[in-house]
């Protein structure tokens, strides 16, 4: 049992060590989104979600860089259990956005969800979870 726990811990630590990795390429999306080079354009009506991470309990910082010129609030939600449990959210503005998030327990299938109902495009450049 100790070996399994150590193995899991090592897996978690390797995930945490890669925290500066841009997660945009791991995101899922509906038909109202498209790739523009290495950026995901979420058009009006578009939904971006994922990347379904498994993370140990600790403090994290979610950083999202977008290009967005709209005036309507664009909200990115942090959820688990297929969106049934909302752990946090942030209003996105043009440029760099960040929130701190504390996970009290091991969290599986952690996802970041952006449903665009702003009438404008939101270009997602970078997502990190460190």
Predicted features along the sequence, with ranges:
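Glycan-recognition and processing domains
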Residues: 3-59, 65-79, 98-100, 117-130
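Extracellular carbohydrate recognition and processing domains
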Residues: 83-109
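Short, aromatic- and glycine-rich surface loops/edge beta-strands on solvent-exposed regions
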Residues: 110-116
């Amino acid at each position: 049992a100790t070996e399994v726990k150590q193995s899991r811990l090592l897996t978690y630590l390797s995930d945490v060590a890669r925290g500066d990795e841009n997660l945009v390429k791991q995101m899922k999306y509906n038909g109202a989104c498209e790739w523009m080079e290495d950026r995901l354009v979420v058009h009006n009506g578009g939904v971006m979600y994922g990347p379904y991470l498994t993370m140990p309990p600790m403090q994290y910082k979610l950083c999202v860089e977008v290009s967005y010129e709209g005036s309507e609030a664009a909200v990115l939600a942090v959820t688990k259990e297929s969106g049934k449990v909302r752990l946090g959210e942030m209003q996105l503005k043009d440029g760099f956005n960040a929130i701190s998030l504390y996970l009290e327990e091991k969290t599986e299938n952690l996802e970041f969800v952006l449903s665009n109902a702003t009438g404008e495009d939101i270009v997602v450049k970078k997502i990190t979870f460190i």
